Amino acid sequence: MSRYTGPSWKRSRRLGISLSGTGKELARRSYIPGQHGPNHRGRLSEYGMQLQEKQKLRWMFGLNERQFRTLFARAGKIREGQHGTNFMILLERRLDNVVYRLGLATTREQARQLVNHGHITVDGKRVDIPSYEVKVGQTISLKEKSKNLQQVKDALEAVASRPSFVSFDEDKMEGQLVRFPERDEMEPEIDEALVVEYYNKLL
């Protein structure tokens, strides 16, 4: 399945959350496209709620359905912890997401572009695979010439805070995943139990 390439604001308004994390998509209108006001949203069925939550999480991290389902299945094979929480942790460990969490990009989409274009290194070696799974203690940085990118400078200036499961050295412009995140440190807008229920009916 191909990745959606349409306007992200339409998806954000449809789901009622900011998928980019910036909040700009909902600044003017928080109701879905096609509605003429905020009070015309229909009530979803149980399946509709599960599907919507799955789409919300998938679009938030920018994965296509095949990638998303594969990662979900992997999470189910982890013996310790809950399936949904383990799935969220695997999503957080993606290289593009860690780049975003470190503040080197303002959105996950921008972080994915940095990785795709070869600007990111892991332990000193260039990695251009957004789905690369970051291990605790690995050092994430920019290629030396990439440290002067204006979009990176702008992103770093915009950082208000970083989650405690990552560390960042401002002088070296490099950071690490210091531990796996706890559930309350990950996306609060997501009810991953609904995602688990959705796939349990299919798989």
UniProtKB/Swiss-Prot annotation:
Function text: One of the primary rRNA binding proteins, it binds directly to 16S rRNA where it nucleates assembly of the body of the 30S subunit. With S5 and S12 plays an important role in translational accuracy.
InterPro entries: Ribosomal_uS4 (IPR022801), Ribosomal_uS4_bac-type (IPR005709), Ribosomal_uS4_CS (IPR018079), Ribosomal_uS4_N (IPR001912), S4_RNA-bd (IPR002942), S4_RNA-bd_sf (IPR036986)
HAMAP family recorded: Ribosomal_uS4_B
Keyword Ribosomal protein among UniProt keywords: yes
Pfam family, one: Ribosomal_S4
Gene Ontology process terms (BP): ribosomal small subunit biogenesis; translation
Database matches in SUPFAM superfamilies: Alpha-L RNA-binding motif
UniProt KW keywords: Ribonucleoprotein, Ribosomal protein, RNA-binding, rRNA-binding
Similarity comment: family membership: Belongs to the universal ribosomal protein uS4 family.
Gene name of the encoded protein: rpsD
Signal peptide, first to last residue: none
PROSITE patterns, A to Z: RIBOSOMAL_S4 (PS00632), S4 (PS50889)
Single Gene Ontology MF annotation: structural constituent of ribosome
Native organism: Lactobacillus delbrueckii subsp. bulgaricus (strain ATCC 11842 / DSM 20081 / BCRC 10696 / JCM 1002 / NBRC 13953 / NCIMB 11778 / NCTC 12712 / WDCM 00102 / Lb 14)
Subunit structure: Part of the 30S ribosomal subunit. Contacts protein S5. The interaction surface between S4 and S5 is involved in control of translational fidelity.
GO cellular component: small ribosomal subunit
Domain of life per record: Bacteria
Protein name: Small ribosomal subunit protein uS4
Domain S4 RNA-binding intervals: 93-153
